[in-house]
Amino acid sequence: MNNLKLSEEIKRAINELGYTEATPVQKAVIPVALTGEDIVAKSQTGSGKTAAFAIPIAEQVEWEENKPQALIIVPTRELAMQVKTECTNIGRFKRVKAAAIYGQSPFAKQKLELSQKNHIVVGTPGRLLDHIEKGSLNVDKVAHLVLDEVDEMLSMGFIDQVEDILSRLPKQRQNLFFSATMPEEMQDLIKRYQDNPMVIEMASEKTNPIFHVEMQTDNKEKTLKDVLITENPDSAIIFCNTKNQVDELTDLLDVKASKIHGGLRQEDRFRAMDDFKSGKSRFLIATDVAGRGIDVDNVSLVINYDLPIEKENYVHRIGRTGRAGKSGKAISFVKTNENPLLRDIEEMLDVTIEKKRKPTVIEVKVNEDAFRKKQQKRPTIKKARGEKLNKNIMKLYFNGGKKKKIRAVDFVGTISKLEGITAEDIGIITIEDHVSFVEILNGKGPAVLEMMRSRKVKGRRLKVNEARKR
């Protein structure tokens, strides 16, 4: 990573995030993206593609510009939040501000956020289009467009909305398209919206074994329990085709499991995802719609309780296992009438999905005790990638904003004059109508908090406190 031509602010962030060695897709994409060329990248899930586009975008945005300069379109809310977090972390020391816009979140609250300075906007197609049509998202200065998981947006029927958004963007812009597969409809999209793009096709790095278990009778629940006991994974994702099936399995399995599907409230979906990512839950039971936003390293087992209805989704599902060079395994339950779909998947992947027999009664009995002990063991909580980067940051709350004619430069001017503080110690600044939030970096938050209690901002004495987490 240190060999890339990046600013010191971006290099510092990626080092603190632990990006010491670039993945193959990052090595291929980042240098080309920094030149402004259009790119089509075929890359599997878990290959590091988010950083592959987030790094060059964070590098190229101009801090002084108030309107969004990059638009990143993704298929799901979970993915929108994850990409936004990644962009924020990578751009932390350059003070790059990113917003996540998606459905089932209050429109008015998003409108207020979009009225602030935002360098990058990440969102789902429908809600992005709503904001553009209503004038709350200005796209006049968008110079970088990313379509992430293009094949997923095609299969979910979002393409008309995506094209509507693209038709409203400036013609002169960089277009970066990322996809795990390359369906024919995507080729049409490339021809219409990209200018002689660099095509980057990454060979699959995965050597993770993939199997299928034949289901002769309707005994999938018992087989699932037996497979979990004999495999005894540290973590596993179980994919179902319906939310009812997700609910039933969550109740049926005698293990601590999180669940995620489109019928849950957004905060419950985020909480379930956080619990699984952190290791509080060893198992996650999910549908495809919700599962597309799952970005978790070190998942040791993926089980397709139901084969996906769309064969392309198989690629996304099994891409959740292993990741980043770690080993993993994928097992699919296949009924007799699903054999044609299994053959289609094998043809698409150009592999043979090996048949695996069901665990025997003896195998289950032998492994049952070890499985129970692992489930009862207190989980080791995993640290989030951005934890090291964010631990020396304090966000301050001030009780004044736009209505008092206060701007970001007023805070920068005042705080940078404090003893021992420079502009490099100031992070992202958010100015709302009646309040403002200022991030203080490098562990200097407590000192700034104390000194600002007796300082004025633009001639006004403002209340200042450490901001509550929102």
Curated annotation (Swiss-Prot):
ATP binds at S43, Q44, T45, G46, S47, G48, K49, T50. Residues 394-470 are annotated as: Involved in 23S rRNA binding. Its EC number is 3.6.4.13. Keywords: ATP-binding, Cytoplasm, Helicase, Hydrolase, Nucleotide-binding, Ribosome biogenesis, RNA-binding. The keyword DNA damage does not apply. It comes from the Bacteria. GO terms for cellular component: cytosol. Disruption phenotype: Growth rate decreased at 37 and 25 degrees Celsius, slightly slower and to lower optical density at 3 degrees Celsius. No effect on motility at 25 or 3 degrees Celsius. It is found in: Cytoplasm. GO terms for molecular function: 3'-5' RNA helicase activity; ATP binding; ATP hydrolysis activity; RNA helicase activity; RNA strand annealing activity. Residues 223-365 form the Helicase C-terminal domain. Induction: By growth at 3 degrees Celsius, and 3.5% ethanol, repressed by 6% NaCl. A motif (Q motif) lies at residues 1-27. PROSITE patterns: HELICASE_ATP_BIND_1, HELICASE_CTER, Q_MOTIF. GO terms for biological process: response to cold; ribosomal large subunit assembly. A motif (DEAD box) lies at residues 148-151. This is ATP-dependent RNA helicase DbpA. It comes from Listeria monocytogenes serovar 1/2a (strain ATCC BAA-679 / EGD-e).
